[in-house]
Amino acid sequence: MDDVFGRMLELSRKGYFCAQILMQLALDAEGKDCPELIRAMGGLNAGIGFSGGPCGALTGGACFLAYFSEGMEPQERDTMLKEFHDWFRERTAEYGGESCDRILEGDPTNQLRRCPALVQEVYAKCAELLSERGLA
């Protein structure tokens, strides 16, 4: 996991945000590179276009799971995504919600204090969910 965290920091220094980092990690796992996809994931940055909406770790995690869901029945995939969302909702309850605004609680320094650990936890949860289904 230390290598993953190091890679997350490297991507963050390049200007990537949560959803982009998670999708790049998915691509890395397959030895792929797709700058167009990473650019598209930028639409999810900071709660969709920096609006403070749904956290990019949540939306990026959902995209990460869907990326690796090839071969799953749609209902099985949706069940996995719901399980992930339920976990994320519980994980972020201490902040009062799952939006970027709630997680940051109006303090921009919370981005440094909270987001890296949250993205790392999301990555671990996604790996766990995929592993449970024989996909990782």
Regions found by a protein language model. Name each.
Residues 80-136:
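C-terminal binding/interaction regions
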Residues 1-12:
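Polybasic, low-complexity association/targeting segments
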Residues 44-64:
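Glycine/serine-rich anion-binding loops at beta->alpha junctions
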Residues 8, 22, 26, 40-45, ...:
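Short alpha-helical scaffolding segments that buttress acidic/His motifs in well-ordered protein cores
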Residues 21, 58-67, 116-117:
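Mg2+-dependent prenyl diphosphate-binding active-site environment of isoprenoid biosynthetic enzymes
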Residues 29-40, 65-82:
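Phosphate-handling active-site elements
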